[in-house]
């Protein structure tokens, strides 16, 4: 059964078994993206128990945090006369403008207190350069500045990545596509994600991921 608000898979995967070559990437499960947050993703809190459950089967877990400066270039408030969810052309490409969110050191930028993943090994903070956004856990939106995650994973001989979190159509999708570009087999755990879906972004994200070779899976199909 597909959770409400999720598009039907374009490229699904059969059940897979987790082993020592696998890592779970938990993307941006932060207070700003949860109910009551400044950029709340609809039903975003519903991913938390799913992620907690599947994380128990992974020895290798990486988490990410959006970590913006005040006045970040992705904020609508930084562009006079612009409103959230409008777009602007910046030097690195088209940028969706967002409400102020995940500002460094604020409670909104904190990871959900309900996450229970004590074995998480690494937290990647992204979007901390004021003049460029960063959806992906691997590469900033300029397509050049890397976070070092790919090298970290490869040094540990991790080859298969499972991506969960918020939001499906932005940080999850960009992370999954960049994971494929870096040579990793990549799955998105559909029921462990939720999307924003602005101007058709969710359907486009799934199509882009399928084109890149990213596979979809449900949490029930992951065998530890």
Regions found by a protein language model. Name each.
Residues 5-6, 11-128, 155, 159, ...:
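Active-site acidic carboxylates
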Residues 69-73, 132-133, 171-172:
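Short catalytic/ligand-binding loop motif for oxyanion handling, primarily in non-cytosolic enzymes
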Residues 131-156, 160:
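Alpha-helical scaffold elements lining the catalytic groove of polysaccharide deacetylases
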Residues 158-174, 188-194:
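Glycine-rich anion-binding loop/nest that anchors nucleotide
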Residues 178:
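Hydrophobic/aromatic ligand-binding patch that stacks against planar heteroaromatic rings
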């Amino acid at each position: 059964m597909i959770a409400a608000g999720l598009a039907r898979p374009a490229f699904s995967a059969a059940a897979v078994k987790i082993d020592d070559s696998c890592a779970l990437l938990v993307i941006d499960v932060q207070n700003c993206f949860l109910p009551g947050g400044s950029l709340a993703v609809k039903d975003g809190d519903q991913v938390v128990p799913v992620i907690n459950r599947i994380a128990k089967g992974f020895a290798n877990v990486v988490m990410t945090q959006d970590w913006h400066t005040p006045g970040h270039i992705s904020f609508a408030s930084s562009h006079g006369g612009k409103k959230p969810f409008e777009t602007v052309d910046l030097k690195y490409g088209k940028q969706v403008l967002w409400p102020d969110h995940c500002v460094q050191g604020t409670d909104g930028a904190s990871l959900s207190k309900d996450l229970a993943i004590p074995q998480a090994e690494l937290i990647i903070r992204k979007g901390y350069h004021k003049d460029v956004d960063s959806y992906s856990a691997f590469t900033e939106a300029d397509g050049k500045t890397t976070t070092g995650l790919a090298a970290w994973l490869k040094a540990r001989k991790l080859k298969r990545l499972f991506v969960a979190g918020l939001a499906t159509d932005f940080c999850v999708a960009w992370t999954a596509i960049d994971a494929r570009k870096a040579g990793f087999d990549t799955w998105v755990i559909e029921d462990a994600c939720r999307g924003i879906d602005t101007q058709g972004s969710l359907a486009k994200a799934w199509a882009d991921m399928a084109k890149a070779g990213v596979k979809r899976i449900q949490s029930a199909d992951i065998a530890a």
